[in-house]
Amino acid sequence: MANRPTELAAFIRSSGEADGWIEESFKEPYVAFNPDVLMYNDTLFNELLLSAHALKINSIQDVQSDDTVEDAGDIGNEVIHSELVTFIETAADVYALDRQCLVCRVLDMYRRNFGLSALWMADYAFLCSKCLGSPPCATATFIAAFEFVYIMDKHFLSDHGCTLVRSFGKKLLTLEDIQRHFFLHGCFRTDGGVPGRRHDEVITSRSKQGRLVGRRGKFSTAGDAKVLYSNYSYLAQSATRALLMTLSDLGSAPLEVIEGRQKSISGDVRNELRDGIESRKRVAHVIHSVGPVHSCPTTLSVALAGWKDCAKNVECNFFQLESCTLRASSEDNDYEHEWELRASEEKLNVVENVQDMQQIDASQCEHHEHARNEDCTMGYGNLVLLLLAGTGSAPEAASELAFMAAKVRRETVDIFWKNHRREFANDVTAAYSACYGEDSEPDLELGPLMITQLKHAITKGGTSAECLLCNLLLIRTYWLAMRKFKRDIITYSANNIGLFHSIEPVLDAWRSQGHRTDLGDEGCFVTLMKSAGTEAIYKHLFCDPMCAARIAQTNPRSLFDHPDATNHDELALYKARLASQNHFEGRVCAGLWALAYTFKTYQVFPPRPTALSAFVKDAGALLQRHSISLISLEHTLGVYV
């Protein structure tokens, strides 16, 4: 330990420095996507919560005229100006195709200096498997980031004195790196973007598949699987980068006016502004609602124009008889049926084990049933609310739960920033150094957008970029509930009542008929659905290709059906099998994801009418090949986001 290489210096725990892990954190076997793990380290939790926020740099500018700011007063007035450009441009660099993955770099550094044990490989394989079975969303990214740090510290902190705690605060790692590694590009995947495909496979050209070309009788090829997948990855990362860059426009407006004061933004003035001094006047400027029509970067425009060819090369249908989504739907139906049978059998066992049924009431019977069917993933409900409350996904005014969660998040991030900014600023990566000065602070009103999948703040038609319902898919009880909820909407009326107008009555029925008792969450599910809003529910269940892809990607067997920590031997065997097989493939082909990313990008950067018409036609054909029925793509493109 005395001769550790300098490349690991940033991760070496200083003498007397606390890493935040509670006692017994590393004693139990690791179970991926376990809510209990989040309670092992409050410091890391708050660090990731801070990292989910963009950092704005404040400055004071003189007001030159009354036209600059309404009611600004005399010439001596000053305006607090806040800019996000510095932070956003630095963060967006993660999505450059030729930029090294920092998660891979950390893994390589640890491998070269310490070696990677079989036990570590088993834990890492478990995390990768869970990420592949999860919908790419804010909650999944937060969990992956926390548990990646956990398994690295579990295996290397005690023996080698290296920790990844504080690496996000110092920007040695970012949530964008986690998203890129585990969800967007998937550096550990082995399928070349198509389930069943090998990463080193040479793909036969689709248009001439089966034909012999030339005298030598060779097949025409579309290219190597890795090359074709890299083209898709470029499209997805370029779209994400462009959507993220729209945030840089939000910091261009003045936020506060101070009459006749000559003060630095640092020090007491920030506290006075936060406390609401009487001398300030807020500028009436709305920046987070329906966004302006942004201009699409030229390189992205070219990539989007070629999305169809990109998608064809990484689409499943041309290589298999059954589409990836059709198989996923069949597997989901089987799992739901098996779970219902299992739940019925356990309920029957509860009744049979009761010696005298007359001496216990229905609530006691229900308690025994829930004890047998306890869903450990229910703990993620609070995390979903903490991350999305107060954003367009769950507005504060929608429910008291959302209001309180947003308040707690803002207070937590604000306090953590004040307590740790100086510490982080001393060792922060050079690219982010300007964002850690006295004049900088997290943008609490913008919220944790850096952890969302699409990373823009535009809201439209009662919807926003991050879908609350997609985040709830990580919870087994809610995954099952949403399937039943959708069926109830479809079967609500035998007449031709629109699906949109069936949502509110079904929500009311779920609330009044006691479905909350069946879910065992005291009505939280219905409250969250109400918070999301009718439009967001409609978009998620019936309209949005991205939501459809996330639903298909969510693998209940991978997420919920595995040994737990009480079965040590079975759990160890399960993880060892994952690591030894080295078989990590997505449930949904990259062709469908290419469509989804193009669709979401066109919602923010609308194409010309001719290009839009061609896109809707081609997108409809791809969705039909995947047996996905959605309502009016052109409507969703223009009305929702």
From Swiss-Prot:
GO terms for cellular component: host cell cytoplasm; host cell nucleus; viral envelope. Residues 101-187 are annotated as: Zinc finger 1. It is found in: Host cytoplasm; Host nucleus. Residues 467-547 are annotated as: Zinc finger 2. Zn(2+) 1 binds at residues 101, 104, 181, 187. Keywords: Host cytoplasm, Host nucleus, Metal-binding, Zinc, Zinc-finger. GO terms for molecular function: zinc ion binding. Belongs to the herpesviridae UL32 protein family. Plays a role in efficient localization of neo-synthesized capsids to nuclear replication compartments, thereby controlling cleavage and packaging of virus genomic DNA. This is Packaging protein UL32 homolog. It comes from Gallid herpesvirus 2 (strain Chicken/Md5/ATCC VR-987).
